[in-house]
Regions:
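Bacterial N-terminal signal peptides that target proteins for export
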Residues: 2-12
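Short, flexible helical or helix-coil boundary motifs
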Residues: 11, 15, 63, 70, ...
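A short alpha-helix capping/helix-coil boundary motif
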Residues: 14, 37-39, 149-150
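C-terminal motif of bacterial Sec signal peptides marking the signal peptidase cleavage site
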Residues: 21-22
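Short, low-complexity N-terminal intrinsically disordered segments enriched in polar/charged residues
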Residues: 25-70, 74, 78-85, 226-229
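Short solvent-exposed beta->alpha transition segments
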Residues: 46, 53, 69-148
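Low-complexity, intrinsically disordered terminal/linker segments enriched in charged
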Residues: 138, 143-177, 181-236
Length: 236
């Protein structure tokens, strides 16, 4: 929590810098040359990039400590939080027919959720989808376990790609005026895009591909990794 406070404090300082810079750019200081304004803008962008790097490192450290999922809420966007809540409800109630119509990354997340639910792997009843995506063997680990390229920052948007193709973003971030937050909702499709190519080559449906990937990952740990996961887990 102390580290989160430090990040917020640094964010406030950067926000103040942005405000002062905008005042200078509005004509309040007409004598400021264009080159000086550009230099000031670049300095702010560099500060925001450093803060983004530190925020991401702190998020990964928080995940590694295995803390409660709600400890990760300050690191993700509000839109991502609502999306995860909705996706958890889908996992609890949506039928095979409806689930099959969803994009691949959501099908994979829902089926993995149902596997965890069936095997009683969840340690909490809150923010379970967030826990699932960020936990060991979760979707986020597909990229965080690989060498990553330098961070890119452009105004209020940030991104991170793989080291071998740093200009192709796989994780997105949003600046919310005081801090950086990970845009999980729009990052997950980018992370799983490479996996989808497997299904295209083999001419599989999204559900067939999801079953294949889950069976490959968990076949030595659990049984019945099959189409039964396309339907909600019985509460009985």
């Amino acid at each position: 929590m102390h580290n989160v406070k430090d990040i917020i404090l640094k964010s406030l300082l950067i926000t103040l810098s942005i405000f002062l810079w905008s005042c200078a750019s509005s004509g309040a200081i007409d004598k400021t040359s264009a080159s000086e304004k550009t230099e000031s803008y670049q300095m702010i962008q560099e500060e925001k990039q450093l803060l983004l790097e530190n925020t991401f490192k702190e998020m990964l450290a928080t995940i590694k400590r295995g803390v409660a999922p709600d400890s990760l809420l300050p690191y993700i966007t509000e839109e991502s939080r609502y999306w995860l809540d909705d996706l958890e409800q889908v996992a609890l109630s949506e039928s095979k027919e409806m689930l099959s119509e969803r994009p691949f990354h959501e099908i994979l997340a829902v089926m993995m959720f149902r596997l965890y639910q069936r095997e009683n792997l969840f340690k909490t009843d809150q923010y379970r989808m967030l826990y699932l995506i960020t936990a060991k063997k979760g979707v986020l680990e597909l990229v965080t376990s690989l060498p990553l390229g330098p961070f890119e920052v452009k105004n209020d948007r940030g991104s991170l790609g793989l080291a071998k193709s740093p200009k192709v973003p796989v994780i997105l971030f949003v600046w919310d005026d005081i801090s950086w937050r990970m845009d999980l909702k729009n990052s997950i499709p980018l992370i799983t895009k490479g996996l989808e190519s497997i299904g295209v080559k083999k001419k599989w449906s999204n559900t067939e591909l999801a079953i294949y990937l889950l069976e490959k990952e968990f076949r030595y740990d659990y049984r019945d990794i099959d189409e039964s996961l396309l339907n909600p887990v019985s509460s009985i």
